[in-house]
Amino acid sequence: LADYIILAVPVKTAIHYLNRLEELALKETVLVTDTGSTKQEIMAVAQSLSFDFIGGHPMAGSHKSGITAVNASLFENAFYIFTDDTTQKKASRIHELKQLLQGTRAKFVQLAPQEHDCITGMFSHLPHIIAAGLVNQSQIFDDHFPEASRFAAGGFRDMTRIASSDPSMWTDILLSNQTLLLELIKNWQVQTSQVINWIQQEDFENAKDIRDHLPITDKGTLPAFYDLMVDVPDYPGVIGEVTTILGQEKLSLMKLKILETREDIVGVLQISFKTKS
């Protein structure tokens, strides 16, 4: 029988599996955890379980999915959040779980379920909704201006990249954090309405805050590029190694860009080509 069970599935599926596990003859000391992005709903279900459950959420991921997107250093130096009922028994079990996961080299943090969902709602879930909205709006825009997508600069791509994440996973996230997200979206509507009023009233004093944050570099438009994303560790010369390999294959680059870094451990190198092959 298993000592540990990790439910690395979308939130709603994890809840379903918890109920299924309750029907099975598990080891008395089994420790179950999940990797879902919301915690209040699943922790409420866990209160009635006969086995120990610790909520888990590694704050690392990729817009890519499937076995081909595997990354051995994915969790390294990323926050790994645990949620529990703060009892002494659970404290010892969290320590046990940290020992099990120490090979990930993640940074372990404990939060209350509500605190977790508020933080991730603001800094992860809401940005995803906004990114998805931008993608949808751009697709409608393309219907009127078929050439428009050719001129989408790097900033737009960076903002909307997360919208390509697994839709089934995000459906569960949005539904299980529904109340908070509705409040955040309404607050966002207030902010955008305020911007609309400033522009309509030509309120340049208030609009200055927005104007000051508009990019003043990378002016003009960019042609359509074909992008390759490469995970690179942080050490001197690593980008040179990548470009040397490409040069040996006589591949001409249009642009190099580091998309993300995590405390000097790993970055995503965006390599842009003019042609697809």
Predicted regions and their residues:
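Interdomain hinge/lid region at the active-site interface
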Residues: H144-R211
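Internal alpha-helical scaffold of NAD(P)-dependent oxidoreductase catalytic cores
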Residues: L74-I162
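Rossmann-like NAD(P)(H) cofactor-binding subdomain of soluble oxidoreductases
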Residues: Y17-T68
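N-terminal Rossmann-like NAD(P) cofactor-binding module of classical short-chain dehydrogenase/reductase
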Residues: I5-I6, T33
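A conserved regulatory-domain signal marking ACT and ACT-like small-molecule sensing domains
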Residues: H213-S277
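An anion/phosphate-binding loop that grips the pyrophosphate of nucleotide cofactors and donors
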Residues: A2
